[in-house]
């Protein structure tokens, strides 16, 4: 036991720390446990991985307080002196699967980019080759072509430039995500362009190269017609890839499975996989960040409620597990009448403590910012070399508010998402831009969207799309698909926007006029 120590700080997997005292037994029994069908172990181990940022006040002073926080067990991790990390066969299998998936995605990405680049070069070099091949192969046999051909050359050059810019703007954009399937319309356009260019080459080879056509003006017009057709195909691509999806046709209800938070989005004609991409892009900016620590209180309450029940068999020992389970359920139902009172008082006490610590935090931050204003007034009288930068000013006032901020983050279970380094950066940012204490506290008083936090706090970087239909199919009324990540899932329900009938009703302006008749007895 002399090699063991208790580390109190912000752990990435703090919600699993209650099981840390059983890791030794599970490690010894892991070699004896039966394997699943896919070759992975049935036991799951918890990898202890502290965040990259420095924990907020993770020193000895916070661990020796007389009054500990109620959730100290959730933010405490036991680390032995021999190893700080543990890994199971399931983790190894997951890592290998992720590596295989990444290799497959990279191959698919580079293959698609190679095919598109080759086809683009073929498209832009084909009209130029149509014009250059006859003068190279049978220059002396060609009929002279003067001003008309020169005008066609200028026209084709500008059309190729417009086509090049339009193709770059439409197709050569940075990929936002890796799709599980190909984009159907884009693949159809590539096939159409390939067949179109091949048919032009076949006609050019049979009717011009084999017969050595002498009409050079006709050859140039043939190349210009190819460029015109390519411009029309580019217009078709804009309609199919961009304009078709602009008009809203469906409403998507997105519900997070853990806490039930939901949002509604309106989309046009999209495939299921592209609709899933739009949902995920909006999820990171609209949904509050997922905090698994908020769910541990209800689980602990249910476990505590069932732990107080015990079944005794007066008839002697037996293996009737079903009867014992029924007895436990019946006893829990009888105790359910008083459990709501416990929940009410627990929530009331928690709200009281949150308000108390919020008030302390607000006062501490306001005093710190007043101190900053005083320092700024004093530094205006100093020499330029003696003035502190915003980073130094943030480090100077941070200790005065650190304790109150730490207690508030711990009672609201946000300690995993705010490291000391991130708080200092935010404080320096607020000082640089002259923000008020309320602007500084807004990030910590309420949970913000996922994009507000560091990427290592998101807990969701890779998603799996689960659907009963092919992901390349378009959206329609009643479709339900699920986006799953490691800790939670997003359930998406598709509803078609109803057809609205508007009728017009004309009101004669003269109907609003009235006559006021006054009498001697009428008081106005």
Swiss-Prot record:
<dbReference type="InterPro" id="IPR009539">
    <property type="entry name" value="VANGL"/>
</dbReference>
<comment type="similarity">
    <text>Belongs to the Vang family.</text>
</comment>
<keyword id="KW-0225">Disease variant</keyword>
<feature type="transmembrane region" description="Helical; Name=1">
    <location>
        <begin position="118"/>
        <end position="138"/>
    </location>
</feature>
<feature type="region of interest" description="Disordered">
    <location>
        <begin position="1"/>
        <end position="85"/>
    </location>
</feature>
<keyword id="KW-0472">Membrane</keyword>
<feature type="compositionally biased region" description="Low complexity">
    <location>
        <begin position="1"/>
        <end position="15"/>
    </location>
</feature>
<feature type="topological domain" description="Cytoplasmic">
    <location>
        <begin position="244"/>
        <end position="524"/>
    </location>
</feature>
<dbReference type="Pfam" id="PF06638">
    <property type="entry name" value="Strabismus"/>
</dbReference>
<feature type="topological domain" description="Cytoplasmic">
    <location>
        <begin position="1"/>
        <end position="117"/>
    </location>
</feature>
<protein>
    <recommendedName>
        <fullName>Vang-like protein 1</fullName>
    </recommendedName>
</protein>
<feature type="transmembrane region" description="Helical; Name=3">
    <location>
        <begin position="183"/>
        <end position="203"/>
    </location>
</feature>
<feature type="topological domain" description="Extracellular">
    <location>
        <begin position="204"/>
        <end position="222"/>
    </location>
</feature>
<feature type="topological domain" description="Extracellular">
    <location>
        <begin position="139"/>
        <end position="151"/>
    </location>
</feature>
<dbReference type="GO" id="GO:0016328">
    <property type="term" value="C:lateral plasma membrane"/>
</dbReference>
<keyword id="KW-0597">Phosphoprotein</keyword>
<feature type="transmembrane region" description="Helical; Name=2">
    <location>
        <begin position="152"/>
        <end position="172"/>
    </location>
</feature>
<feature type="topological domain" description="Cytoplasmic">
    <location>
        <begin position="173"/>
        <end position="182"/>
    </location>
</feature>
<keyword id="KW-0812">Transmembrane</keyword>
<dbReference type="GO" id="GO:0005576">
    <property type="term" value="C:extracellular region"/>
</dbReference>
<comment type="subunit">
    <text>Heterodimer with VANGL2. Interacts through its C-terminal region with the N-terminal half of DVL1, DVL2 and DVL3. The PDZ domain of DVL1, DVL2 and DVL3 is required for the interaction.</text>
</comment>
<dbReference type="GO" id="GO:0060071">
    <property type="term" value="P:Wnt signaling pathway, planar cell polarity pathway"/>
</dbReference>
<feature type="modified residue" description="Phosphoserine">
    <location>
        <position position="86"/>
    </location>
</feature>
<dbReference type="GO" id="GO:0120197">
    <property type="term" value="P:mucociliary clearance"/>
</dbReference>
<feature type="modified residue" description="Phosphoserine">
    <location>
        <position position="88"/>
    </location>
</feature>
<keyword id="KW-1133">Transmembrane helix</keyword>
<dbReference type="GO" id="GO:0043473">
    <property type="term" value="P:pigmentation"/>
</dbReference>
<keyword id="KW-1003">Cell membrane</keyword>
<feature type="transmembrane region" description="Helical; Name=4">
    <location>
        <begin position="223"/>
        <end position="243"/>
    </location>
</feature>
<dbReference type="GO" id="GO:0005886">
    <property type="term" value="C:plasma membrane"/>
</dbReference>
<feature type="compositionally biased region" description="Polar residues">
    <location>
        <begin position="73"/>
        <end position="85"/>
    </location>
</feature>
